[in-house]
Amino acid sequence: LASELKEFFPNNSVVYFVSYYDYYQPEAYVPQSDTYIEKDSSINEEVEMLRHQATASLLSRRDVIVVASVSCIYGIGSPEDYAGLAPNVDKKVPLERDDFIHALIDIQYDRNDYDLARGTFRVRGDVVDVYPPYAEHPLRFEFFGDEVELIAEIDEVTGEMLREYEAIPVWPASHYVTEKPKVKAALKSISEECEKRVAELKATDKLLEAQRLQQRTDYDLEMLETMGFCNGIENY
């Protein structure tokens, strides 16, 4: 269907948004054997790229057609936070290299100076290469002091410049990016709810369940506080 629509609307952005799981096993508990089975999944990187392309197109263009499955009804974070946290790099606007790096970390890009994969960035002197999860090729940003001298799309293997830009937004590496005040409020709310539920479990002599819930929640809260993200964040 998406391919047909691209033929009918060659000048529009026709994008594809479906579930990115190749395999998904929800968490489960077998009381007979007291066995806890953690959630397990495998994500299709190509489909994940298409999902990010759909999001980026919706926020940057008006001529967008989205082909989606029912998975699009599930919440994936705030559009306002997703758009508001994305740095818009413009040659005419002063920007320090270190400030740009901090902005990338805030929107959940991982630094990897050896293997530039989607969702990562690398730093070599005044040059920052970013590989957005929605892009076919990485972006290169060259700085001189607080000036952005070059914004270009490059070949990930040869480093050859493919296209140059005057300005470009860098959209987040995850749909679940959230402003820090909201994260702090969520941490407080989750902690309070956990305490209440743990007390209920202990009151009914379900000590093992209470310990497991407390341990898992504490781990997730620590990840949210330090990284801004945790596995299973959609459950919160």
What is each residue range found by the language model?
Residues 1-236:
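ASCE RecA-like P-loop NTPase motor cores
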